[in-house]
Amino acid sequence: MILIICENILATKTVALSLGANTEAANGIYTSDTVTVANIPPRFIRQTPLCELAEGEYPFMPDKFRMSVTMKELERQLKPLFRAAGEVVFASDGGADAQARFFNICRHFRVGCPRSRMWLTRLSYGAIRGAFHFRESGRHLHRLAQTGLVSKGMDMLFAYNIDQTFLHIGLPEYDLTRQEAIALDYVGDLTGRFDNYNGIPDGHSIRVNVNGGEGFESEAVWEAEEDALAVADEIPVGETVSATLTVDETDRLNIRFHTLLTLQMDAFNNLGFMPVQTLRLAQSLYDKGLISSPLTRCSHLPEKLRGHIQTVFPETPGYRWGENDATIDHHAIITLRAIDRELPEKEKQLYWLIFNRMKAVVEQQPSRKYATVEFKIGEAVFYRQWELTGEAYEVTETGSFQTGVTIADAAVYPCDAPVAESNAFTDVMCAVTSKAEYVDEMMHTNVPYTLETGDYGSALDSLVRKGLVTLDGDDVYLSPEGQYVYDEFAGREFAEMLLTWQFEANDLYEGDQTGRSVIEGFSSSLLCMVETIDPEAGE
């Protein structure tokens, strides 16, 4: 008998129906002659909080963590199922955090039979049967679980010790998570740069008008106005100079399908939904089989889904199918079927937001064309760039061409004051996520999207709810309480330390080190962090 474990009741029912397990043996357990599908909620096994183990000790860096079962009746129902199983399959759309929960379940029930994984990216009958047929097994799943276990251990170590540190130095407990600390540090740095920004231009550029009014900007910037004026005096006003016209074509700036991050950003900007609300609504739509899994950072679709997309949009000129980082198990968020029943209004709004993004992607121009005219006078280079649209897009070929421009006039201007970084909520959400993911992307750790360590939108949302960050319209700032916390972090590179150790945990997936070495290294770094904030720690 094959035992399949799911983590929510709607997914359990859908998987059971898809695989013919039509007999309900107990609440949340469905069987057939060959397959049993059981719902085991994430809260089934509880990690014992360190505050219950520390007995007041601070700092507290235990070698081992404890866990306990919270649902005894379900445990009694599951024991005979695990004993009878010839294979245990985990069916989920989650990443390392979900795989770690499955690992703990198997350890609790002392599973000795083979284990495998179904990736439930889409809760449709065909997709579920395909995932079951092509279920994965192998050492990489154990390594994925180790990444999740180590990440959870670091969460617990950080949460307990940073709370105790704050209490020891006279601040309240904020139940700060690692992700919230990283986000708070980013907002604090950003707020500091805004406070120090004086808007004074720090150089001069030359602007040239040619051929009836088009403006060209010098590529170089001169610190002294006299130097810029000397260059401007050499510009032959009224004469024609040779120039190069370059037309480039790129799809780099095209609209992409939604990821969880862009969906949270889009929903905030267009619907006013906070990130946690967007995630909850998207999870509900996924559970109902209306959209694919929202737990993704991939903005592309695999070739295998071309047929599905073309049942909705027969022509897809705006999307270039082909090689990308999407697979049938990990891809962008898309709608799977039409709404066939009454939905809560906010779920309906989010569904149509996803659908309209899909429509925009497939109906856009397949690429964008940009024209750049560049000419040189002495050592000074002047350029102008614009996007080609409409008929110009259709008739203009790519390449480089020689042309000429007649200079009408030239003048020296103070440089525009440098544009400060944006503190718009969605821009901050995007920036802190990009910062957190940068090393993993560069080093290709390839860890599937993991909600507990990757959702910085929800971390910022939590900071707002805790009163550490203020949301003023669409902009975010540190609150006075947040400033007190940030003052303990400022200039000490704590966020970089936390991100470094998360990368080390993610690197476990590649099998390059052990979980114990990562936890020990993180504990040492965390102890240094605690002692930096509170020199009296441990006394």
PLM feature spans:
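Intrinsically disordered, low-complexity regulatory segments
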Residues: 1-162, 185-188, 402, 410-421
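Active-site-adjacent bridging/hinge elements
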Residues: 77, 158, 163, 236-241, ...
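Catalytic phosphate-handling regions of large nucleic-acid enzymes and associated NTPases
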Residues: 194-201, 286-309, 324-337, 365, ...
